């Protein structure tokens, strides 16, 4: 993974960053999301200081990330429990089913 410079327009400024080329599109998307969230925050609340709007948006995004991580963790636990239940069911079925031995004769 070689890093290449990418130019992003963010809050009226040009930022030059290095990141792997295959991540350029994702970084552009992230910058666009952050830019729109900060602009929306400033418009909605009347906050004039970019730093304050950035701090609030960063806090909101961090909160959203934590919420998603908690959801993912709960889903993983549910899936793990279902896998364990299915495994027990299959083991029970396997133990109660008589195995048949195939007999072959070569003429």
UniProtKB/Swiss-Prot annotation:
Keywords: Cell cycle, Cell division, Coiled coil, Cytoplasm, Septation. It is found in: Cytoplasm. Signal peptide: none annotated. Gene3D superfamilies: Cell division protein ZapA protomer, N-terminal domain. One of its GO terms (cellular component) is cell division site. Pfam families: ZapA (PF05164). Homodimer. Interacts with FtsZ. Activator of cell division through the inhibition of FtsZ GTPase activity, therefore promoting FtsZ assembly into bundles of protofilaments necessary for the formation of the division Z ring. It is recruited early at mid-cell but it is not essential for cell division. This is Cell division protein ZapA. It comes from Mannheimia succiniciproducens (strain KCTC 0769BP / MBEL55E).
